Amino acid sequence: MPSFDIVSEVDLQEARNAVDNATREVESRFDFRGVEATFELNDANKTIKVLSESDFQVNQLLDILRAKLLKRGIEGSSLDVPEAFVHSGKTWFVEAKLKQGIESAVQKKIVKLIKDSKLKVQAQIQGEEIRVTGKSRDDLQSVMALVRGGDLGQPFQFKNFRD
């Protein structure tokens, strides 16, 4: 029986490349001359720390980072940015977390979405991924389109497609 897995992963090497590209752009931009503005990727925590001298500049840096992530194939919705920025001395910073895996609440929404579609497929939650099995490949492709079209707050990838 054909099956595939729904996952939500961020390639850390691509994220590192995007952070490096964003750093290069900030170094060459006129409005950031003489300003302390940095990006730091923490592989262990899967976070990106954005630091600058004002909250407005932190927002600008986040926009640059999102653009560079998108260019490297990582959607902006995979970046979880807190609403409040931290003010410490003369600097402002924010730690944006890269979303890895699918949370259980989102998993339940996906399974409910698939079951409500009345397609002849079964969805099973397996850890941080969802296995979808069905008799026809067309039904599985319909499920892929359904999950992509649903506004669930994070990007999804499909892997382990088996016939």
From Swiss-Prot:
InterPro entries the record matches: DUF520, UPF0234-like_C, UPF0234_N, YajQ-like_sf
Pfam families: DUF520
Keyword line: Nucleotide-binding
The keyword NAD is assigned to this record: no
Entry GO MF terms: nucleotide binding
Cellular component, GO, one term: cytosol
Tagged with keyword Metal-binding: no
Coiled coil location: none
Protein family per UniProt: Belongs to the YajQ family.
HAMAP family per UniProt: YajQ
Function summary: Nucleotide-binding protein.
Descriptive protein name: Nucleotide-binding protein CKO_02735
Organism, scientific name: Citrobacter koseri (strain ATCC BAA-895 / CDC 4225-83 / SGSC4696)
